[in-house]
Curated annotation (Swiss-Prot):
Domain of life per record: Bacteria
Enzyme class: ligase
Pathway: Carbohydrate metabolism; tricarboxylic acid cycle; succinate from succinyl-CoA (ligase route): step 1/1
PANTHER family recorded: SUCCINATE--COA LIGASE [GDP-FORMING] SUBUNIT BETA, MITOCHONDRIAL (PTHR11815:SF10), SUCCINYL-COA SYNTHETASE BETA CHAIN (PTHR11815)
One Gene Ontology term from the biological process aspect of the record: succinyl-CoA metabolic process
Family, similarity comment: Belongs to the succinate/malate CoA ligase beta subunit family.
Entry protein name: Succinate--CoA ligase [ADP-forming] subunit beta
MF terms in GO: ATP binding; magnesium ion binding; succinate-CoA ligase (ADP-forming) activity; succinate-CoA ligase (GDP-forming) activity
Keyword Metal-binding assigned: yes
Length: 387
């Protein structure tokens, strides 16, 4: 789960991380009132969406008077903001964050995330802040792995601080800043805390000028305050609905719908589709306890995507029985008008019974495949009108 910048900064404050004063606004008039209350003579007007690159997309403006605050608020609210992270469709801006300006001497990048290969917490830092870390020369990036059994220590901060060119006094301040970030990361079960930029002010203090946070969904039951920050407007409606039925669904931009059991098999299926010249329209894992009803719901969700031209169902029956999947497919054809071709590959528990069920139904646009590659090739051919 991701949260907005203003929410991430609320959490930063709780852990003693310096952030500028700011508040949320839902209208241009409210933005002006917020700026008045904050005081000062420079304010940042920031679009609040779950994506980076807002500045380049026109979603962050610096206002030097209240008239400009109102003008920029009117420009940003209601706009569809397109960035590298939103995709071409962009995201609708429903709220903005008004923040006091600060005296910036230098910008940096710093983040904490989980290094799965090392099973440690990855600290990434760069003196090139304010831009996407993927665009920075690798020689300007410092990476460090922190053993969670040991935690962040002063020597970690000093090693990174030396790389960033800090003197002793700044290293001590950087350690305090970084220690707050680390405690925030651990305490909230975050999978990402990204400060871009972290700025050094004219007063030689470190501030989080922007903050991005993501969390492990499986740990949200331990954090009711964070779960309450979820903004469903920022999430794909089909993905939200799928979760309610125990389905793991992620919408993509291809034209071959996928329905698979197990995340590993799902990723392997998508790779095979790509290898065969196709492009997946989604990731969909029906899980191990799929019933005929959940399979029918999965079909309904896939078919809602008008880009989908064929569907590939790839099931290996272990816990989930293949005959349940077959019944779900047949149920889906009764409840929803399935006009596109459906390729079905079933193997494992009750696979023979399942295949017989589909044969007996004799539905014209359901095709059977014996293995993964055959199924993927057929799904790609059917998209192109071949058989």
């Amino acid at each position: 789960m991701n949260i907005h910048e203003y929410q991430a900064k609320e959490l930063c404050r709780e852990f003693g991380i310096n952030v500028s004063n700011g508040a949320l606004a839902l209208s241009a008039d409210e933005a002006v009132e917020v700026a008045k209350k904050l005081g000062g003579n420079v304010w940042a007007v920031k679009a609040q969406i779950h994506a980076g690159g807002r500045g380049l997309g026109g979603g962050v403006k610096i206002a030097k008077n209240l008239d400009e605050v109102k003008k920029y608020a009117n420009q940003i609210l209601g706009m569809t903001l397109v960035t590298k992270q939103t995709g071409p469709k962009g995201k609708l801006v429903r709220k903005i964050y008004i923040e006091q300006g600060c005296n910036i001497k230098k910008e940096f990048y710093v983040s904490l995330t989980f290094n799965r290969a090392k099973e440690q917490i990855g600290l990434i830092a760069s003196a090139s802040g304010g831009m996407g870390i993927e665009e920075v020369d690798k020689n300007l990036i410092k990476t460090l792995n922190i053993d969670p059994q040991i935690g962040l220590k002063a020597f970690h901060a000093y090693e990174v601080g030396d790389f960033l060119g800090f003197d002793k006094d700044l290293n001590n301040k950087f350690y305090k800043f970084l220690n707050g970030l680390y405690k925030l990361y651990i305490a909230t079960d975050a999978n990402l805390v990204e400060i871009n930029p972290m700025v050094l002010t004219a007063e030689d203090e470190f501030f989080a000028l922007d903050a991005k946070m993501g969390f492990d969904d499986a740990a949200l039951f331990r954090h009711e305050n964070i779960a309450a920050m979820r903004d469903l407007d920022e999430e794909e409606s089909s993905e939200v609905e799928a979760k309610q039925y125990g389905l793991s669904y992620v919408k993509l931009d291809g034209d071959i719908g996928c329905m698979v059991n197990g995340a590993g098999l799902a990723m392997g299926t998508m790779d095979t589709i790509t290898y065969c010249g196709g492009k997946s329209a989604n990731f969909l894992d029906v899980g191990g306890g799929a019933s005929a009803e959940t399979v029918a719901k999965a079909f309904e969700i896939i078919l809602r995507d008008k880009n989908v031209k064929s569907i590939f169902v790839n099931i290996f029956g272990g816990i989930v029985r293949c005959d349940r999947i077959a019944k779900g497919i047949l149920e889906a054809t009764k409840l929803t008008k399935v006009e596109i071709p459906v390729v079905v590959r079933l193997d494992g528990t009750n696979a023979k019974e399942a295949i017989e069920l589909l044969k007996e139904a004799n539905i014209e646009n359901i095709y059977s495949a014996h293995d993964l590659e055959e199924g993927a090739k057929l799904a790609v051919k059917l998209v192109n009108g071949e058989k």
